[in-house]
Amino acid sequence: MFGSVWEWAGKIRHSELSIGVKAYLVLMELKKLSDDIAYWKANKTFSTIETATRIHHRAVVIHSFQNGNGRWSRMLANIYMRQNRLMPVKWQDDLLSKENVKRDAYIEALKKADTGEYEDLIAMHGVTYWL
């Protein structure tokens, strides 16, 4: 999509960042996420919204790309929701890209999810285009 603008666009990262898993683990972690998604769905481990939330969070944690990981993670969760007959989350990406109260709440919800507390992030996934 942006390959003509940024050479790294859409390519799995091979360099270390201050966030995300080690670069050599990215592909393994994506495979584990894919396997977990299949397991969660087959075993009805979580509701669709909670599964989408966990997909979003894990994709952020993995941090597969040099840039755009938040947008990609939110899109991935929305694709899962659409595949499961739910409307996508209304993220307001323009507000998440700059410092403000909504971005702060979003970052805080991701940090809580890092500790296993998904409630705030699940609540954010409940704000869909149906509303």
Feature map (PLM): residue ranges:
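FIC/Doc superfamily catalytic core
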Residues: 1-131
